[in-house]
Amino acid sequence: MEAVELGAHLTLPEVVAVARHGARVVLTPEVRQRVARASEMVERLVRERRPVYGITTGFGKFSDVPISAEQTEALQRNLLMSHACAVGEPLAAEVVRAMLLLRAQALSRGHSGIRAETLEMLVAFLNLGLTPVVPEQGSLGASGDLAPLAHMSLPLIGLGEAVVNGERLSGAEALQRVGLRPLTLTAKEGLALINGTQAMTALGSLGLHDAQVLLKTADIAAAMTAEALGAIPAAWDPRVQALRLHTGQQAAARNLRRLTEGSRLTTRPGQMRTQDPYTLRCLPQVHGASRTAIEHVAQVLDWEMNAVTDNPLLFPDDDEVISGGNFHGQPVALALDYLAIAVAELGDIAERRIERLVNPQLSGLPAFLTRNGGVHSGLMITQYTAASLVSENKVLAHPASVDSIPSSANQEDHVSMGTTAARKARQVIANVRRVLAIELLCAAQALEFVGPERLAPATRAAYAAIRERVAPLSGDRVLAPDIEALAELVHNGELVAAVEAVAGPLE
């Protein structure tokens, strides 16, 4: 991907390109000019000693405490230090890179009062490969992601920790390694850096991308299972779908028809049975519902990726500063709870398909897909693992956004818990990726008994991609590496790419 331009409409593929693939980020002269106007306004407010929250006053419960011009720099530095109290394991580098990009995008809109040189340093972190160390726990999701963003910002002033070329360093040493010097923050800058929803949105945007891959993967895995079990694709007929106006259902049915077109394994009604069980017959309805939910999440996150979410906001054209609540993460929190539920359901139905594959009473195939049952257990325990993962997801799918707890002496008396929702959704997605990997493993093995050469062209491509990484099961072996290999095949998009090279783009 070409360089990502700050200040233009930021897209999900651009976030992924910067976060995961190191795409460069550029600042245009227009963005610098916009940012400078708001910064000049802040300087004037300080000179005029106008009472403005976070610029000439303290924060939270201390919002009525006046701050002199001489205390401005200390106020901003103290803000970063005092708010950097997150705990837990560090967020993944890709998440922190997404945070940096999203915070820079919000600041580039010119309503935050940050200086151009401070924004340029955030961009330099991305382009030079300096990744702040950000612990994952400690955000309430209002006022934004204060603690995570404080940790993200500490290296700007030579504090905290950062990773450069895989080495974890002090903030000061990390700056030195990449040829940068610490900044001295001026009025409003500390607050502008940490008051926003970028931790939850970073986690959510990368999770959304992965969920979109899982949607296609779930259709591919289900199509392979359907062929292995001699399913009846009549249930996916477009005339059936047209009588229900859910677009996600219709898209899922189109995918399934495309994936199984040309199959010599699927059957007609009455050929083997009159109708299939729900896990095969209702695939468009279940996968489609998740698809519709994820499309809603995509819209919410697209808005949030391009939002200005700090407080107060400056409007230089009107010479006005307004204290608002754009930092409140409730829209994102609700969406990410929805994301977790939608993806968890993809795993729930996949686990039931796995059971149909390994259970001889349901499949008509050898028990646990091994030719020598008794001495060999075959794929018996893979279903246990899938059952464990989907059961864990039932706990993780409990919504975080219905919770709230007051903070800052009850000044900040309702919070979103959006970053908790984001972290849970990320784990649900990782779990479902492995559930689908197990289904792919089982479906490919089941096909060894019915003839993979009879697969549809699209699912034959999926089978070939699987067999490049995992051999057929001839006897018992350690299966954990097989599951992880197929989970990576899903995660890196290679399975979907192999299928789409034959079938064309899936929806």
Swiss-Prot record:
Belongs to the PAL/histidase family. Pathway: Amino-acid degradation; L-histidine degradation into L-glutamate; N-formimidoyl-L-glutamate from L-histidine: step 1/3. GO terms for cellular component: cytoplasm. Its EC number is 4.3.1.3. GO terms for biological process: L-histidine catabolic process to glutamate and formamide; L-histidine catabolic process to glutamate and formate. It is an enzyme of class 4 (lyase). It catalyses: L-histidine = trans-urocanate + NH4(+). It comes from Symbiobacterium thermophilum (strain DSM 24528 / JCM 14929 / IAM 14863 / T). Keywords: Cytoplasm, Histidine metabolism, Lyase. There is a cross-link at residues 142-144 (5-imidazolinone (Ala-Gly)). It is found in: Cytoplasm. Pfam families: Lyase_aromatic. The modification 2,3-didehydroalanine (Ser) is found at residue 143. InterPro entries: Aromatic_Lyase, Fumarase/histidase_N, HutH, L-Aspartase-like, Phe/His_NH3-lyase_AS. It comes from the Bacteria. This is Histidine ammonia-lyase. The keyword Cytoplasm applies. One of its GO terms (molecular function) is histidine ammonia-lyase activity. The keyword Cytoplasm applies. Contains an active site 4-methylidene-imidazol-5-one (MIO), which is formed autocatalytically by cyclization and dehydration of residues Ala-Ser-Gly. CDD domains: PAL-HAL.
